[in-house]
């Protein structure tokens, strides 16, 4: 996510990071105007889900799959509002998409669940979705809750 933060930072945008403390890797990137560090994955995932208006997933490892699965499940079950969910990189996400299609074929999920997300290489789709939603003006009180949670 450093590249996205870098671009926004360069044009004077607010860049907020939700970092997790791990035994290896996962350091905040230098382009954040604000960073919240969490000890526990569940607290980070809840915070990410509460703060987001659009979800954009790039190729990643188990953590990425964990976060994506959580968002898909919460969306499918109606536990959070439907929001645009983009998986960037068709070559990478093709197999994942096939697994989801197989789940629908086997009636393990509804056919409509296949449409919860969009696999694309077209970043303009993401920009258009974000622009439709607009840039929410989130009060500082909203982030105060994250500050408190990240200090636990």
Regions found by a protein language model. Name each.
Residues 1-57:
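Acidic/glycine-enriched connector segments
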Residues 99-117:
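N-terminal glycine-rich dinucleotide-binding loop that anchors FAD/FMN and/or NAD(P) in oxidoreductases
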Residues 39-88, 134-142:
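Active-site/ligand-binding-proximal alpha/beta "capping" segment
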Residues 2, 66, 94, 127-128:
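Alpha-helical elements of the RecA-like P-loop NTPase motor core of helicases
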